[in-house]
Structure formats: structure tokens, C-alpha cells
């Protein structure tokens, strides 16, 4: 898989360069795999190290990927706050930004941290941070969430 991924990223990089752009890749669409740990077969490098001029980014619920870990310079991780990892948020915000889902309108600040509109784009590596809340408006089934995943305005 990693060899195929490297081939595809190489193609993307060439297409982006032909248009005068820098390639950006989000590795985890629905998973939370620590790609920084996986070496591409036949190399001693992970995928980010193999493509130092490509920007990689992901969301993760795993706080241990930030704390005392050295991530590749071209890999930006945004913490995904949920009801079961909320207690880790303050510590994580010292290292990165955090995505938080809100019911209704986004607040200007939350728990003393500035909130920016994360629904405008997904290029989290362009955000100011650490210590910034990436506010997302609850959509679909999340609008009816009662688990604590979605922050209600009374809590904001």
C-alpha cells in the first residue's frame, strides 16, 4: 500500500508543479493511522520524509501523537476533540490546533481560545496555531447529537 501511495503522491506532485502549485495530501480520510511511524518499503523513510516538499495534514483523536513526539516538519496534525478526549484538549492545544463541533453559530472564543471557521476550507496547515479552535458547525446526524461530541451554545 505505501509503495502505491508513494507512486500516487509522486504523480500528484508533478501535476501540482506543472500548475505552479505545491501538493498537499490528507492521508487519513476516515482512519487515524500514525503514518509518521510507517516506513515505505525499500527505504528507511516514512511517506512524509520521502516527499519533503509535499505538505501532509490530518486530523487525529490520539493526543499521544503530539505530546513528546517529533513529527515531520511537513506534517500538520489537528486534534479532533470529542466527548471522550475533551480532558486532553488543554494539553494538546499547547502543541497544535483542535477541531471542535458546535451546534448552531460559532462562538468567537471557546474556553478562552480563539475560534476560526473550519468549514471555510480543510487546509488546516495554513491556520494560525497552536492554541486555536477550528470551529465546525454540526451537520447531518450530528445536529441531533446528545453524547457531548457537539458543543451546545450554552457550553460555548
Show which residues each predicted segment covers.
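Class I S-adenosyl-L-methionine
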Residues: 1-156
